[in-house]
Amino acid sequence: LKFVVLICLVIMASTSAQQCGDETCGAGTCCAVFSQNHCRRLSRMYDLCSDHADASPSGNYLFFCPCEPGLHCDRNTWTCTEGSSRSE
């Protein structure tokens, strides 16, 4: 039974992680591309951000991570805000 639990934990950890250059990004982070790839935390309220739709095919973002859950990236200011994800 302990072996089964261990296998489940390994599978859960591997599905929530993202390879980012030589690093593996965990939950609450993304792979942001500068001159090299770096794991960064998801953007918070008023932080600069990338839109979820702007991810590369490999799942990387240019410069900034998307916003953490409950926020959206305002395409006018490129900052995380609350409310509707539509630009007005």
Curated annotation (Swiss-Prot):
Pfam families: MIT_LIKE_ACTX. Belongs to the MIT-like AcTx family. Residues 86-88 form a propeptide. It is found in: Secreted. The keyword Ligase does not apply. The modification Pyrrolidone carboxylic acid is found at residue 18. Residues 1-17 form the signal peptide. Expressed by the venom gland. It comes from Illawarra wisharti (Illawarra funnel-web spider). The keyword Repeat does not apply. Keywords: Disulfide bond, Pyrrolidone carboxylic acid, Secreted, Signal. GO terms for cellular component: extracellular region. Disulfide bonds join 20-31, 25-39, 30-65, 49-73, 67-80. This is U1-hexatoxin-Iw1d.
